[in-house]
Regions:
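C-terminal segment of classical bacterial N-terminal signal peptides
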Residues: 21-30
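N-terminal soluble domains immediately following signal/targeting peptides that reside
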Residues: 30-216
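Bacterial N-terminal signal peptides that target proteins for export
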Residues: 2-17
Length: 217
């Protein structure tokens, strides 16, 4: 191999290594921005990790609730990255998301993510800055489930894994949990070159303007 080829090989190797490191950092960041829990559902253990699509999320962004669901490694169930962990496909037929904010609720159909087994998405656009609750419900392993996840105001949480044992419902027990995901934030400080005004704020402005016009008639 001549010197030119050796130089090119070294360059390509360095680039490939950088890409792998960047990908690893992205995976770690995604994991931290979601809340992972280990559940015993029926006779099997599952890791169910829930968060918002495209975090960090701002008001009026295209986002949504997403879940990563895998069968835990029987030999090392408390380790979500164990070699025997298996992503579960086909659950879009048996589960849904219910999103809620204040007294408003809405059911969303779950779709499998493109070419990412075990990853399920339900798209929506958060219209105000508030605390959102994602309820994953339906059946898993022929057992009825209703699992509540709530965003954290002020940003995502990392933290160490906490191993707990608590029955949630018949046939469903939580065994471990870690992390958290942030609530949608205001775009007021992120807008450029002009301050961003949300759709909800625009509607409020229009209503106030109409109210003022009606009062002068």
């Amino acid at each position: 191999m001549n010197q030119y080829m050796k130089k090119k090989l070294v360059q390509h190797t360095a680039i490939a290594t950088a890409i792998m490191m960047a990908s690893s950092m992205l995976v770690i960041s995604t994991a931290y921005a979601h809340e992972g829990r280990l559940y015993s559902i029926g006779d099997k253990d599952y890791w169910i990790t829930v968060g918002s699509i495209n975090e960090p999320v701002f008001v009026d962004d295209k986002s949504g609730a997403e879940a990563f669901i895998s069968l835990a490694d029987p030999s090392d169930p408390f380790n979500s990255d164990a070699n025997g962990t298996k992503n579960i496909e086909g659950l879009e037929k048996t589960i849904k998301f219910e999103i809620s904010a204040g007294d408003k609720k809405k059911e969303l159909i779950v779709e499998p993510a493109w070419r990412d087994p075990g990853h399920y998405e339900a798209t929506f656009y958060p219209t105000i800055e508030t605390t959102y609750n994602y309820r994953l419900f339906g059946t898993i392993n022929n057992v009825s489930v209703s699992l509540d996840y709530q965003c954290v105001p002020g940003g995502a949480q990392e933290g160490a894994q906490e191993n707990v044992t608590k029955q949630i419902s018949e046939g469903v027990t939580i065994k471990a949990q870690r992390g958290g995901f942030g609530c949608p934030a205001s775009r007021a400080d992120a807008g450029f070159p002009e301050p961003y005004v949300s759709n909800n704020e625009l509607v409020s402005m229009i209503k106030e303007l109409q109210k003022g016009q009606n009062s002068t008639k």
